[in-house]
């Protein structure tokens, strides 16, 4: 950071930084926390979800928790490109939203959704066709393969909707509605997923527990669609009024 500051002072002399201007601004701080706190909560929710699912699965067999752990590691390779896409999408949407350029905002959202869908379809296809190959990366035993192959195929069904939900969540944050993103994330990983997984575990059939992921994703997709429509409507009004 000091090195970057030094380079900035050398090459950007038109920007002058004075100590008297570095002060606490409650209005700016409020906006930072309004966007940042939901992101912090969403990051922590994943740990709670993992803990809850492990507790539910361990009742059946420790191998089920091993399968879930393997899945959690493998799925990161599918979701990582989506998160990278988000990192590039959010500043573009935020800038053009502030500049009242609706066409660029909606074009960015549309292209991001298409790209996310392609990535997720590829991930879904790999999980459907090569589940045993993926599990063998973890030296899976016969028991682990017997549990893991159907698990990966069932859980990967949720990929088909997950791309849209993740993009929508980032759109909410980019346009200044982080609460929508928080609600969707909480419902997806806690309010729906864990209770449904627990209820399905009461049947005594492990394969049914995996269906809690697609069920939670359907609920997430529904909420994301509703919130996105509201966001689009309000964003259009704001950008049109700014343009006028």
What are the language-model segments listed below?
Residues 28-35, 57-76, 103, 142-149, ...:
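Interfacial/gating helices of multi-pass transporter permease domains
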Residues 44-71, 77, 95-96, 133-142, ...:
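Helix-terminus/linker motif at the lipid-water interface of multi-pass membrane proteins
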Residues 1-11:
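Single conserved hydrophobic/aromatic residue that forms the stacking wall/gate
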Residues 76, 142-168, 187:
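Alpha-helical transmembrane segments of multi-pass membrane proteins
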Residues 5, 151, 207-226:
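Small-residue-rich transmembrane alpha-helices that serve as helix-helix interface/gating elements
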Residues 122-145, 149:
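Short membrane-interface helical motifs at transmembrane helix boundaries
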Residues 21-52, 56-57, 77-81, 85, ...:
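Hydrophobic faces of transmembrane alpha-helices in multi-pass small-molecule transporters and flippases
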Residues 67-125, 129-131, 162-184:
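Small-residue-rich hydrophobic transmembrane alpha-helices
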């Amino acid at each position: 950071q000091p090195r970057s500051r030094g380079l900035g002072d050398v090459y950007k002399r038109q920007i002058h930084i004075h100590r008297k201007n570095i002060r606490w601004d409650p209005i700016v701080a409020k906006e930072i926390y309004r966007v940042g706190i939901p992101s912090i909560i969403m990051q922590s929710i994943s740990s709670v979800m993992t803990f809850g699912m492990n507790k539910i699965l361990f009742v059946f067999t420790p191998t089920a928790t091993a399968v879930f752990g393997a899945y959690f590691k493998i799925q990161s390779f599918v979701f990582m490109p989506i998160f990278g896409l988000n990192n590039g999408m959010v500043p573009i949407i935020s800038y053009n939203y502030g500049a009242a350029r609706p066409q660029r905002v909606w074009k960015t959202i549309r292209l991001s959704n298409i790209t996310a869908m392609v990535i997720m379809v590829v991930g879904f296809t790999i999980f459907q066709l090569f589940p045993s190959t993926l599990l063998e990366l973890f030296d899976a035993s016969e028991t682990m393969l017997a549990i893991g192959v159907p698990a990966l195929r069932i859980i990967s069904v949720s990929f088909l909707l997950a791309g849209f939900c993740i993009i929508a969540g980032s759109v909410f944050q980019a346009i200044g509605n982080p609460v929508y993103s928080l609600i969707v994330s909480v419902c997806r990983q806690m309010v729906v997923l864990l209770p449904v997984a627990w209820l399905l575990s009461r049947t005594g059939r492990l394969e049914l527990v995996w269906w809690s992921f697609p069920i939670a994703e359907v609920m997430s997709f529904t909420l994301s669609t509703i919130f996105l429509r509201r966001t689009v409507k309000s964003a259009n009004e704001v950008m049109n009024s700014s343009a006028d």
